[in-house]
Swiss-Prot record:
GO biological process: translation
One family name in Pfam for this protein: Ribosomal_S5_C
Protein family membership: Belongs to the universal ribosomal protein uS5 family.
Residues in S5 DRBM domain copies: 13-76
Subunit structure: Part of the 30S ribosomal subunit. Contacts proteins S4 and S8.
Function noted in UniProt: With S4 and S12 plays an important role in translational accuracy.
One GO CC term on file: small ribosomal subunit
NCBIfam families reported for this sequence: rpsE_bact
The UniProt record lists the keyword Protein biosynthesis: no
GO MF annotation list: rRNA binding; structural constituent of ribosome
Domain notes: The N-terminal domain interacts with the head of the 30S subunit; the C-terminal domain interacts with the body and contacts protein S4. The interaction surface between S4 and S5 is involved in control of translational fidelity.
Source taxon at top rank: Bacteria
Protein name: Small ribosomal subunit protein uS5
Length: 165
């Protein structure tokens, strides 16, 4: 059996269930339950993805969420794979997130959801503060927006059309 390059890369991704939600609908025969799941995948080296899915069975919701997360992979700019290059503050649907770079040895100082996202992204030293909404979906969206807005020194110099070594 031969594995393609894509399937080999996906095998390195770690999958975590961030939130599971159960909804009920009252029908003639009783209650009918459905589930939604928010799934996070990452390799700890700068690749990260998030997926949200709904299904009538919990296992199906988790599986579909994992597939959606693998389709939405992003790559994150870090400083030597350790911290972020600069401070960033983002607003997303009522949730605010502040990310600050930290010195080596600080670790990840953040709430549980944001900590999990940063660990799976491979960031080791960072300070994060979540403000506003505590909705998990909004916090995850804010974290992804913040991580996508990061730019390296090289990118900034290139945008300014400055050549520097």
């Amino acid at each position: 059996m031969t594995l393609s390059k894509n399937s080999h890369k996906e095998d390195q991704l770690e999958e975590k269930v961030l939130v599971v939600n159960r909804c009920s609908k009252v029908v003639k025969g009783g209650r009918k339950f459905s589930f939604s799941a928010l799934i996070l995948v990452g390799d700890g080296k700068g690749r990260l993805g998030c997926g949200f899915a709904k299904a009538n069975e919990l296992t199906d919701a988790i599986r579909k969420g994992g597939e959606a997360a693998r389709k939405n992979l992003i790559t994150i700019e870090t400083l030597d794979g350790d911290s972020i290059p600069h401070e960033v503050l983002v607003d997303q649907d009522g949730a605010q997130l502040l990310l600050k770079p930290a010195k080596p040895g600080t670790g990840i100082v953040a709430g549980s959801r944001i900590r999990l996202i940063l660990e799976m992204a491979g960031i080791k030293n960072i300070v994060a503060k979540s403000l506003g909404s505590n909705n998990p979906m909004n916090q995850v969206k804010a974290a992804f927006k913040a991580l996508l807005s990061l730019s390296s020194r090289k990118d900034v110099l290139q945008r300014r059309r400055v050549t520097h070594d």
